[in-house]
Amino acid sequence: MFMNKCYKVIILLCIVHCALCIPAWSQKQLRELVVTAKRPMKDIGVQKTTFDSLALKENIALSMADVLTFGSSVYVKSYGRATLSTIAFRGTSPSHTQVTWNGMRINNPMLGMTDFSTIPAYFIDRASLLHGTSSVNETGGGLGGLVSLGTVADVDSGLNAQYVQGIGSFSTFDEFARLTYGDDRWSVSTRVVYSSSPNDYRYTNHDKKVNIYDDDHNIIGSYHPRERNRSGAFRDFHLLQEVYYNALNGNRFGLNAWYTGSNRELPMLTTDYGDERDFENRQRENTFRGILSWDRSGEKLRFGLRGGYVHTWMAYDYSREITEGNRVNMTRSRSRINTFFGRFDGTYNPSKRWIFTLGLTAHQHFVRSEDKQIILQEGDKDIVGYDKGRIELSASASAKWQATDRIGLSAVIREDMFGDSWAPVIPAFFADALLSRAGNIMLRASVSKNHKFPSLNDMYFLPGGNPDLRSEDGWTYDAGISFDTGSTKPLPFSVGGGLTWFDSHISDWIIWLPTTKGFFSPRNVKDVHSYGLEGRLNVAFEPARGWLVDLNGSYSWTPSVNRGEKMSPADQSVGRQLPYVPRHSASLTGRLSWRSWSFLYKWAYYSERYTMSSNDYTLTGHLPEYFMSNISLEKNLSFRPVDLQLKLAVNNLFNEDYLSVLSRPMPGINFEFFIGITPKFNRKK
């Protein structure tokens, strides 16, 4: 173990040495190193993490799950490459994370969560995290927080195009194309991403052992076999069309249309001894999201209207070959989701010290879920699932007051309705104070109550749904300090960071438990106390003319403990850390750039996670901690007709053998090469 760690350190030092010897390119300008003490009034007391465009546009193969893994300290739970990836803040569950795209909530209404592996980072222009109480400014239900994703209307003037081709390990192919047109009034953008791979990476299967025999058939040893990821192929297609029109009189109109077509096999578990040719385990999805928007900006009054529609068709098919040539369908699950969306936002600035906001959001869901393979003995079809509709309304009002040049106060009142059930009023209070202009030292604090209604599966899924479930609710407290400073002379640099304490008490936590009838059913059983620290540090400096070093790090300590009553004398979950919640998580990104070269190092860490509520420290009861390192080297070339971008990415640099989810192996070291072509339509040759 010691030699292994030394080996990794030596390789890392060699990489850093090589990077210092290789020129690297800089997209960041000196102006980004200048820090001012002014912060927007809309962010009074808000705990927010914002991702820059370099992280989002690093390479076309990245999903938002990858960006969040290496760019923040939230927990990303991944079932493998190109499989379900969910996000959880502050020791909560994925359903406690709300996700919006251009203001429209995109959480799956059946499950209550979002699969971030299906969101290409190249389709996102703005991304930020609102931690804890700060999510109440946007929506209710975010007991952990909110992920805000969006696109922007600004494109370069004239006709512009970009094409990127990626070729990687495991016969992986990634393609991206974008075509834009812009003038004083119109902004038009079309983006396309296509990714495919057999995804048959090799791994060491620690859940199996192969015995070694001598000539007398006595066992003299054993080893863990090397296997390939079986049934893991995928094909993902994404198309994003945007049209914006600026009337130049304060009115702006927009259209966003996003289509996703996904065809993915579900990989076999490491404990499965079957032959992948004997079965099919496949999930398909077709999703369309569309938004029409109108924004009106005046001197003191601004408002916006949005209307949207989401359609999702999902299919899960599982079949096995019982005898040679005789394949039997076991499951043919089909789900259809239709969601209609409407939103109004208004902002009034009567003076420089006051901002008032009013918001109203509506989501109408229609969901049909069934298994077409279930047949009763009489021959009639039996629906396993449900066919339900639910209206979800959320209204909010806020007042933000800049009491003095140093002190800001904010209050938010929110009211939510799901179906015919109204939640108690959700209050939230925020405050911040500028302690020192030197260093821009800011103190922030907030408190809020929040509610999370059960998902449609929780209430109506057959068999097991529980329509009598109560909403989860709790109080969250935040307090933190941050600083930002910098200079342009004599050595240009900027340094920023922050530390936040949070404390959350959530009652009536929903969990699915086994019943005497042979299936699982959800119940309100837990009271959870989640608390801890979140820290961040950003450093950027120019050691010499044209050089830039940029470091960004984050860390979270998140104990999340079950404080409820014992369900039975044998219940050992009380007082224990929740399953699949790491106590420690961290990330680090370092960029070295000079002229047209760029070297990037990314690192992520998760501490051990328990797989059972009793926190049993057994072979299958916990997952070891793991460290992940990725690097990339990029070169930009400029010619008269086109610009070229060349990039080599190395993922899992140290060939870490790890699991994010029990019995779900992850790939070892792998490579991908990208070439980008940008024609110069509008530039002088």
Question: What is the role of each PLM region?
Answer:
Residues V243-S262, Q283-W422, L434, V495-W501, ...:
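Face-selective signature of the C-terminal outer-membrane beta-barrel domain
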Residues A65-R105:
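Extracytoplasmic beta-strand/coil segments of soluble accessory domains associated
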Residues R31-N59, T86, P94, A127:
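N-terminal periplasmic "start-of-domain" segments of outer-membrane beta-barrel proteins
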Residues M104-G132:
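Short acidic/polar hinge/loop motifs at secondary-structure boundaries
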Residues G158, Y181-N281:
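Periplasmic-side early beta-strands and strand-to-turn transitions of outer-membrane beta-barrels
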Residues M64-V67, S85-A88, T100, T114-S117, ...:
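N-terminal periplasmic accessory domains that precede
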Residues S297-Y318, S436, R444, E472-Y531, ...:
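Membrane-embedded beta-barrel scaffold of Gram-negative outer-membrane proteins
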Residues Q402-I407, S494-H505, N524-T611, D643:
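Gram-negative outer-membrane beta-barrel transporters
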